[in-house]
């Protein structure tokens, strides 16, 4: 299903653009499984600076490339991340599936919570206005107006309650590993709840999501090893792909 494949397209766009900026080949970093062939995207960008991709992905790639030329790799990542999640949300809305729309909201909430905690730990709250994503259960404005130590209260009514409490502690120097694990577990819990539905779309879509996540993990591990990445970098990519 395309919704579960979008993230591969944006991963590959990031790899292609950053490799070009560094003057190296992205081969070994590209992942299969996206809506568009990764090798074709690489060749098109290298030869003509264009991509066979969705309109949203092409627009985001052009903006990201411009930011990389201005030596703003963080800005490039943020533009592509925002476009990726926006495409996922739009596609979920088109399906009219409450399960899929809730799944994407869960992913956006987890991404925003991670962003808020990392910004607090690094003392870089100025990045929040352009880093936080629209479309979650908690608004970017609400997150920006909340002190890091009170993130648990802001997300307390949802699936990220435990993660938010650990995030509040991590923002002040607590364990980042426990916080990241809790974010992953919250998404797993959302899928697990759907598995208990005996019939209906949830059962099928939950199965697809679980299989896609397993395939994603295998691809990232194998690609990372082939590229000589450290175990820590591979673990980071696994978290970001969830």
Briefly describe each language-model feature range:
Residues 1-242:
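Extended alpha-helical surfaces
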């Amino acid at each position: 299903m395309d919704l579960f494949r979008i993230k591969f397209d944006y991963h590959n766009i990031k790899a292609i653009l950053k490799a070009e900026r560094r003057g190296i080949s992205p081969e070994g970093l590209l992942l299969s499984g996206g809506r568009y062939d990764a090798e074709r995207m690489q060749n098109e960008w290298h030869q003509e600076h264009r991509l066979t991709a969705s309109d949203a992905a092409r627009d985001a790639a052009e903006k990201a490339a411009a930011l990389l030329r201005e030596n703003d790799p963080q800005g490039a990542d943020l533009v592509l991340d925002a476009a990726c999640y926006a495409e996922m949300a739009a596609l979920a809305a088109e399906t009219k599936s409450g399960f899929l729309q809730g799944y994407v909201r869960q992913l956006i909430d987890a991404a925003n919570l991670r962003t808020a905690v990392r910004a607090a730990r690094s003392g870089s709250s100025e990045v929040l206005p352009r880093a936080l994503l629209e479309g979650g259960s908690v608004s970017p404005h609400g997150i920006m107006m909340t002190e890091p130590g009170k993130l648990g209260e802001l997300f307390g009514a949802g699936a990220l309650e435990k993660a938010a409490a650990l995030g509040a502690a991590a923002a002040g120097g607590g364990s980042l590993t426990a916080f990241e694990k809790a974010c992953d577990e919250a998404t797993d819990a959302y899928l697990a709840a759907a598995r208990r539905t005996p019939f209906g779309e949830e059962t099928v879509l939950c199965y697809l999501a679980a299989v896609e996540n397993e395939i994603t993990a295998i691809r990232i591990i194998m690609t990372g090893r082939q590229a000589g990445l450290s175990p820590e970098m591979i673990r980071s990519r696994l978290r970001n792909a969830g």
